[in-house]
Amino acid sequence: MEFQLTSKYKPTGDQPEAISQLTDGIRQGVPAQVLLGVTGSGKTFTVANVIANVEKPTLVLSHNKTLAAQLYQEMKGFFPNNAVEYYVSYYDYYQPEAYLPTTDTYIEKDLAINEDIDKLRLSAVSALLSGRKDVIVVSSVSCIYGMGGPTALNASIISIRKGQKLDRNEFLRSLVASLYVRNDIDLQRGNFRVKGDTVDIAMAYSDNVLRVAWWDDEIDSIEEVDSVSFHTIETFEEYKIYPANLFVTTKEQTETAIRQIQDDLVEQVAFFKEQGEEIKAQRIKERVEYDMEMIKELGHCSGIENYSRYFDGRQPGERPYCLLDFFPKDYLMVIDESHVTVPQINAMYGGDRARKQNLVEYGFRLPAAFDNRPLRFEEFHEMLHQVIYVSATPADYELREAEGVVVEQIIRPTGLLDPEIEVRPSENQIDDLLEEIVERAARNERVLVTTLTKRMAEELTEYLLSHDVRANYIHSDVATLDRVKIMNDLRAGVFDVLVGFNLLREGLDLPEVSLVAILDADKEGFLRSHRSLTQTAGRAARNVNGKVIMYADTITESMQKTIDETARRRSIQLKYNADHNITPQQIVKAISTSLPTTRTESGTKPAPKPIVLQPQAYIEPEEAAMVADPIVLRMTKEQLQKSIDNTTQLMKQAAKSLDFIQAAQYRDEIVRLQQQLDGK
């Protein structure tokens, strides 16, 4: 099937030329190109047109889940009749296994999986396995992490057709081999049930149920039915059932893996004994032998991913399979906000290796654990065929890779100009900012304020609230779903000012924002670099009254670069508008959640409603000892639930900061609070 781009818009401004240049480059085999597009110039629309022109399966890579979700929704809107998929980490919470030798503390892996995202991941892989060419996968850096290989997953696909001679029990055994679980009572995703000559399969990658009926030993009908009403949605002559999990294996592979694990265990025990490390030798022997027993009896064990090399048949050091292996060789990669995404890819391997070093060195894991990892950057680079780096501020790496093939997109379809930048002294900056906020609020416009620290963001929010300004804050401690709610509330006018730390930059689409205030703009560093300042200033580029105020006592080199580049772009935009008699038009955009949803027969299944975050002053986090407080015993159910929610956020942040001891304490605290709640 061909890509069918659906949009009420036509390419305008710089878009037609950008689309033409990028399309020609791909058709001519150019390996790397840069799309340097200013904020609000319609880079996603340009990329969508290029995809439609070149007809290649495409991986769109973003640096975080929120922006990936936004891109997914946009691509889904542009290509409603094609396979637009979403592939990000399915962990709501993930605390990796770790050992801290300084305190002799071992922390077990702990996680919570989001079933909806797991379904979307399986759907993405299933679309690629199907062989169809009209596939767009929007992904985070999860795409470079290990998973089952294409050969094993292809071997687990069950192909059936109406009229086929097939023993029903043989079919059931195939389902089990593809990791579907029989459950005749509660038909959940990834389960199947048997009623007489009918088998219902709740496919792991879909909201609906596949119903297969037999007449004697022949398949009589294949239907997709609604998972609630069981009304027929569609009938099929033939159908492919894809595995229920991205990690599948055969009995023979398992037996071979166990033999190899046993051999490596003997070798590792001998190594520790030669070093005089009897405790480590005993530890690794007990742990691995227990894991092998679990694999023999149940087919899996806790931490089985650390043995993935054996099941995949890989050699030590050989890269793992990942999502990129499922694309054909001539696929297209689009790296969004490449100045952030590329360094993130580069950093993944080192962090993973550092954590596992202690686990292997102290006898908690075999050296094979090192091979359950993300791709090294050079491995990732080798798997690229053709790539478009998309950014308003491309880094030196992307410019070198493109060898000068840079396509500029400076003109916005709306005629909007880059915002004016004004530098004001930092003395009395808060009072001056307050006046600007009052002026914007009176015009029903919004304001973004960016600070240097989280604490400053929270304290400034508290100050604004005390002066009757409707304000809120956002930073990395705020949960992803809550961030979406906060952004939507800002756009809807629930509050007028959003104060941020390091999240008011790439990809935020807030056309109601007419002022961006950058406090302490002259404090050189990562948050006040040329690229950071340009990205932050770009948040005001979607409003016809857009303006940026930098509060600073001196003009740094980074500030000057941003001011000069903005002035250059404004002059080009002003000339284009004058030549074409264009009056800048305010962007009007509907407010909706940017998180992906899955479809059901009755319509769209919305994302869970997030908790409304109330602005509050900064409070240093307390150690996890809440349950020891006698007041907890007198808490109501609502108060206990709120405490659980707050402690869960602290746990996630501790895990993200690699403070595993604190995260484990928070986890235990949550368990005890939950017990207290259950007893009410």
PLM region spans:
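Conserved helicase motor "Helicase C" RecA-like lobe of SF1/SF2 P-loop NTPases
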Residues: T151, T453-H475, R672
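Pre-Walker A (Motif I) flank of P-loop NTPase domains
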Residues: Q28-V34, K56-P57, K133-V135, E445-R446
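Conserved pre-motif I regulatory segment
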Residues: M1-V34
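Conserved helicase motor
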Residues: Y87-A98, K109-L120, T451-M456, N472-N488, ...
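N-terminal cationic and glycine-rich segments that engage phosphates or anionic surfaces
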Residues: V34, Y87-D432, E436-A442, T461, ...
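Short amphipathic alpha-helical segment within the helicase RecA-like ATPase core
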Residues: A69-G77, E97-Y99, E459-Y463
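Walker A/P-loop
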Residues: Q28-V50
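Conserved strand-helix element at the start of the C-terminal RecA-like helicase core
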Residues: P57-A69, Y86, K280, R440-E462
